[in-house]
Amino acid sequence: MTQSALHTEFGGIAALRDALARRQVSAVELAQSGLDAAQAASGLNAFLHIDPELTLAQARAADAALAAGTAGPLAGIPIAHKDAFVTRGWRTTAGSKMLAGYASPFDATVVERLAEAGAVSLGKLNCDEFAMGSGNENSAYGPVRNPWDTRAVPGGSSGGSAAAVAARLVAAATGTDTGGSVRQPAALCGVSGIKPTYGTVSRYGMIAFGSSLDQAGPLAPSSRDLLELLDVMTGFDPRDATSLQACDGQANESGRVRRGHDAAQAGYDAAGSQPLKGLRIGVPQEYFGAGLAPDVAAAVEAALAQFEQLGAVRVPVSLPRTELAIPAYYVIAPAEASSNLARYDGVRYGHRAAQYGDLNEMISRSRAEGFGDEVKRRILIGTYVLSHGYYDAYYLQAQRLRRLIAQDFQRAFADQCDVIMGPVSPTVAKNIGDNRDDPTADWLADVYTLGVSLAGLPAMSVPCGFGGQDGRRPVGLQIIGNYFDEGRLLALADRYQQVTDWHQRAPVSQDA
């Protein structure tokens, strides 16, 4: 199994952009190499949809723009999109049989903005069905395998994105994060990934799971690469009702407000130019309890020690409702999912049962056949907690708890620390099938990421070591910031990556 494409010979996105500008390599060469690598690594099952003609057409357009001097900041950079973003030309399934064969007539805003910047898409990436899962085992099209150890899960729900980046099939990928679905697979696959502040990246064209939680974010080898993508992806979008006006900028010719290379870059520059001496790193005691595996704890502690050597100060903090984030999330997210997924009934689009008697039977059969077990489970939970007899007892209580969780974070940032650091996941990647008989075990894997999502804060995962019995399963460090603090998070990650090489390590070839 070939694990890397031509782009790896040039380094990160900035170096690759320079190589393209100097004509040391062409966008077509990069695209063809990526397509070849993706085919050779098909055993990972990271890609769901590849169309070489579409990819090479984009690459030729990028080469033409480079020759004409009109290239965007990502011209020719090979990327791929999680199959939760609708894409004109490529099928979009959200990892579900329900949407098998669906072709969107438009691009998601994230896809559109990256295309406008010149990025070349190699295709659509596998994911847990409707982004519901922590191991990418819930896809209707089979599980994704972790490039570091193909017996292991890559994490989820953006497992295809993390696996493709880790295997160096693409320079970067898009993902979505509802309860940890960018950060957790990034950690388990040894790549960098960031969930921005809720509302800073448009959700338009992103297939909805939990609308008050869903947020798009990029995955790439390094924090500098993440900054390159995030500066293109962020910005106010009037087509998304949850898009924040705080991200506005100049309107383009179409009238759509866009933000360019500003807030995240400014925060990155400001934080990157300052010494770390005196930076207060909050370390939650609840993140280092009995549930944290020793190998993960050791890697995270070593990363914290590295920051201390750089001048930062470690400060103990408390997030007392950390474990309560699990029940709060698994009330709120399923409630929103049950509403969002009600549209898939086989009438307008989506899977339609072949045999049925009347309209009601057609809808019930179509949904029974089209949805997988985990999606059905969450729809049932969501319907239950929204029912008349239980709405107050479950849903409203969960929303109250959500507010208290957000207040815990704000109290820590206001009085005690500048950023918060800890593990992303309590363990390294499990083997595929380990939790097949206990589906709720995957829910517990997000204990350190759910509170951040409920609060709407930005957070990222940075590779910080390895664990597992053979020492080859990656561990991620989670860096959490206050609202709109993405630039600082990326700058801190970059300072760490300047003195460590975890993000530069790639898995050796192995048969999948």
Curated annotation (Swiss-Prot):
GO terms for molecular function: ATP binding; glutaminyl-tRNA synthase (glutamine-hydrolyzing) activity. NCBIfam families: gatA. The lineage of its organism: Bacteria, Pseudomonadati, Pseudomonadota, Betaproteobacteria, Burkholderiales. Keywords: ATP-binding, Ligase, Nucleotide-binding, Protein biosynthesis. It comes from the Bacteria. Belongs to the amidase family. GatA subfamily. The keyword DNA-binding does not apply. The gene is gatA. GO terms for cellular component: glutamyl-tRNA(Gln) amidotransferase complex. This is Glutamyl-tRNA(Gln) amidotransferase subunit A. Allows the formation of correctly charged Gln-tRNA(Gln) through the transamidation of misacylated Glu-tRNA(Gln) in organisms which lack glutaminyl-tRNA synthetase. The reaction takes place in the presence of glutamine and ATP through an activated gamma-phospho-Glu-tRNA(Gln). It catalyses: L-glutamyl-tRNA(Gln) + L-glutamine + ATP + H2O = L-glutaminyl-tRNA(Gln) + L-glutamate + ADP + phosphate + H(+). SUPFAM superfamilies: Amidase signature (AS) enzymes (SSF75304). GO terms for biological process: translation. Heterotrimer of A, B and C subunits. Its EC number is 6.3.5.7. InterPro entries: Amidase (IPR000120), Amidase_CS (IPR020556), Amidase_dom (IPR023631), AS_sf (IPR036928), GatA (IPR004412). The active site is at K82 (charge relay system), S157 (charge relay system), S181 (acyl-ester intermediate). PROSITE patterns: AMIDASES. The keyword Ligase applies.
